Amino acid sequence: MLRTRLIQAASSAQRAFSTSQKALAAKQMTVRDALNSALDDELARDDRVFILGEEVAQYDGAYKVSRGLWKKYGDKRVIDTPITEMGFAGIAVGAAMAGLRPVCEFMTWNFSMQAIDHIINSAAKTFYMSAGAVNVPIVFRGPNGAASGVAAQHSQCFAAWYAHCPGLKVLSPYDAEDARGLLKSAIRDPDPVVFLENELVYGTAFPVADNVADKDFLVPIGKAKVMRPGKDITLVAHSKAVETSLLAAAELAKKGIEAEVINLRSIRPLDTATIFASVRKTHHLVTVENGWPQHGVGAEICARIMEDQTFFELDAPVWRCAGVDVPMPYAKTLEAHALPRVQDLVEATLKVLGGKVGKAAAANK
């Protein structure tokens, strides 16, 4: 029943979206269309690529990410599966070992717990255990993290979970450019990739450059992007927390504080070079994520800073702005308070800057 509710909720919550061809002709692109067009490109480019998962074919996907692809490519390239994540993830990993390039969709990453043995013990470790003889070129993708009103068992962020495991690459796109370019790179990659999308931005349209529509447009794995330059403090985020960071940076600008916002894009490998370069410039850092704080992505960034000479560039301790350390509440008001808000991030920034707030504002006038 819960899966049925998720499908119905996804269907009713959809904003207007177009086919791949229309999306690629636009100056703006939704994340849903970006993912759809990336899948279309790679299915057309390489006949080893195929998609499998629950409702991905005739229903066009629970969130319509695979819309039109079953009609275009048929039953052998876009495959509906039974409700058994362990079963179809195992099929996908075996197919990858045999030389195909599966894209395995989870209706939500929370359901990947049913398939975690195949992801961690089979996909991630086979290249190492075979001494490099067997690649596992597979993409596991689907919505990750907090959605809206789906409570504790369907709102977890798995970025830190999977980034802990050697042998996996873990990507967390934010906007349409990220989604299209990173998914194409993931499908072409020789290693298993965990691709963590966010349901809440599927229908959001982002401005895109003309080259994003190119068939070979790729976003490199392991490279972060500076979304907003600044000189007073660095805000490092991934997925929807990038939006929170950009909004907070706009509020901070009203106070005369210039925050630099970094979109990680890639959780493993982690682009420490971009983070370190920014911290050497701003001398202050706040990490932002919707996942839990303990052993999270922000905690790893803090550790990397501590282990590098960049630590000596800090003028104040690093601050983590993360989800509250509790299972996600169902009540809407409590749910809103369980995730970092713009005001939370503004307050964290002011605490890190401390007495330098007035000086920064004066210097930036």
Curated annotation (Swiss-Prot):
UniProt superkingdom: Eukaryota
Any matching Pfam family: Transket_pyr
Tissue note: Expressed in salivary glands (at protein level).
CDD domains: TPP_PYR_E1-PDHc-beta_like
Subcellular location: Mitochondrion matrix
The keyword Cell cycle is annotated on this UniProt entry: no
Name of the protein in its database record: Pyruvate dehydrogenase E1 component subunit beta, mitochondrial
Organism: Drosophila melanogaster (Fruit fly)
Gene (UniProt): Pdhb
